């Protein structure tokens, strides 16, 4: 067993919304990209110059974000039952200091025009930190 730390991102999708497969894929992609944009903003990057080589030069080598960018971009999709459950996970991530990006769909193609919280991405962060938040959830 390796002592190397692993990084990952977990995307939690609300299953009570009964979204179509394509909608789920789009929402998960929004969440993953949103977390990267948050990371870039947090690190005060110029997005026009935010190529991976430049990002790697600015993020501490020991950070989970750098590990994630340099490795396999591990993403795992799991589900939760309700909006309240997702919001509780988001609060837990905030309390723990784990990067979290929530997605509120505009409602143009689903949800009868009502903006709706669909999912959240947790991380990239060290796997054990993300697991403390999402480890009990079932795979999507």
Regions found by a protein language model. Give the residues of each.
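Positively charged, small/polar-rich N-terminal and surface patches that mediate targeting and assembly
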Residues: 1-140
């Amino acid at each position: 067993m390796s002592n190397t730390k692993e990084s990952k991102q977990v995307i939690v999708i609300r299953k009570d919304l009964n979204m179509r497969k394509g909608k789920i894929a789009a929402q998960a992609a929004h969440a993953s990209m949103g977390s990267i944009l948050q990371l870039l903003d947090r690190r005060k990057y110029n997005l026009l110059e935010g190529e991976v080589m430049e990002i790697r030069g600015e993020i501490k080598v020991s950070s989970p974000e750098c590990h994630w960018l340099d490795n396999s971009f591990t993403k795992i999709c799991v589900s939760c039952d309700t909006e309240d459950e997702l919001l509780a996970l988001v609060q837990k991530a905030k309390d723990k200091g784990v990067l979290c990006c929530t997605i509120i769909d505009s409602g143009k193609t689903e949800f009868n025009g009502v903006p709706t919280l669909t999912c959240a991405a947790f991380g990239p962060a060290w796997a054990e930190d993300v697991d403390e938040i999402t480890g009990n959830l079932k795979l999507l």
